[in-house]
């Protein structure tokens, strides 16, 4: 449920509320859990989303990087695309030098996966971020 709440709050623009849940996301990682059920969202992805909402950029980058390594090792193509999408949202929010270029690359990669899997709503979300 935590993953759904954090992701939902971020998608609704309630970043401060999602940020408050970051300590709980870190607790899940501390238990050794890798995936949250029933949404099959990686704990590191969830922590990255919450850290992004809290503007803890370095922590978010680390969580997304670990999550991507896990998703590639499993492999889980859908989670890879989701990690990229949420990482992009963090990069666009942070807006540091080079972030926009990196975001564009990640979005193109996510778009390929969403297209191959056949996820039209996610394709729309990625295309709106590309603009």
What function would you assign to each model-found segment?
Residues 1-131:
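Helix-coil-helix junctions within alpha-helical repeat/solenoid scaffolds
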């Amino acid at each position: 449920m935590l993953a759904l709440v954090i992701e939902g709050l971020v998608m609704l623009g309630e970043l401060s509320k999602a940020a408050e849940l970051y300590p709980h996301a870190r607790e899940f990682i501390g238990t050794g859990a890798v995936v949250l059920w029933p949404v099959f969202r990686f704990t590191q992805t969830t922590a990255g989303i919450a850290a992004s909402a809290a503007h803890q950029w370095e922590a978010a980058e680390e969580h997304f990087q670990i999550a991507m390594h896990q998703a590639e090792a499993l492999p889980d193509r859908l989670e890879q695309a989701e990690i990229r999408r949420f990482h992009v949202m963090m990069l666009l929010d942070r807006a540091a030098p080079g972030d926009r270029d990196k975001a564009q690359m990640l979005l193109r990669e996510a778009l390929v996966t969403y297209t191959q899997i056949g996820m039209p709503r996610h394709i729309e979300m990625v295309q709106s971020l590309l603009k």
